[in-house]
Amino acid sequence: MDADSDVALDILITNVVCVFRTRCHLNLRKIALEGLNVIYKREVSKVLMKLRKPRITATIWSSGKIICTGATSEEEAKVGARRLARSLQKLGFQVKFTEFKVVNVLAVCTMPFEIRLNEFTKQNRPHASYEPELHPAVCYRIKSLRATLQIFSTGSITVTGPDVKSVASAIEQIYPFVFESRKTIL
């Protein structure tokens, strides 16, 4: 088994965060009173609205900025954001769906082997930091992709990046390095 052989790794996207604007002022009190599945947080001037399908939670500010979390793909995030904008239109607001952007993607990938974290950190020192007293994972940053990876000794890797493509690229880029530091089975 070598690092160049094609190993199919499953990358499971667990959360996609997106932002969009409505181009109108939103009356949070009206949304709280008339909207469905809402929680009004008056002390921080925002409303949380939950959709069931797709399963998304939106944070709504009166300025018209909305952040959606909980989607499992970029397409699902866009569908959820549009559905949310539509529900605000039904409440009587002049909503225009603009400036949609995926800002963060969280994914998990499991390697088919365990990883020696001390060895991995020594070999990749400028990009990797490992402090076992504080956190059980190595933090590895890839600046060109704007991705951060949390690498655990079990072989589980958590990746945070700006989009799905950069998350997949980060896994492809890190695989040869973690392969070199894998634990050998006796």
From Swiss-Prot:
GO terms for molecular function: DNA binding; general transcription initiation factor activity. It holds the Pfam family TBP. GO terms for biological process: DNA-templated transcription initiation; embryo development ending in birth or egg hatching; transcription by RNA polymerase II. Gene3D superfamilies: TATA-Binding Protein. The keyword Repressor does not apply. GO terms for cellular component: cytoplasm; nucleus. It is found in: Cytoplasm; Nucleus. InterPro entries: TBP, TBP-like, TBP_dom_sf. Expressed ubiquitously with highest expression in the ovary and testis. Keywords: Cytoplasm, Developmental protein, DNA-binding, Nucleus, Transcription, Transcription regulation. Belongs to the TBP family. Part of a specialized transcription system that mediates the transcription of most ribosomal proteins through the 5'-TCT-3' motif which is a core promoter element at these genes. Seems to also mediate the transcription of NF1. Does not bind the TATA box. Members of the TBP family are differentially required to regulate transcription and development during early embryogenesis. Particularly regulates genes that have a role in catabolism. This is TATA box-binding protein-like 1. The lineage of its organism: Eukaryota, Metazoa, Chordata, Craniata, Vertebrata.
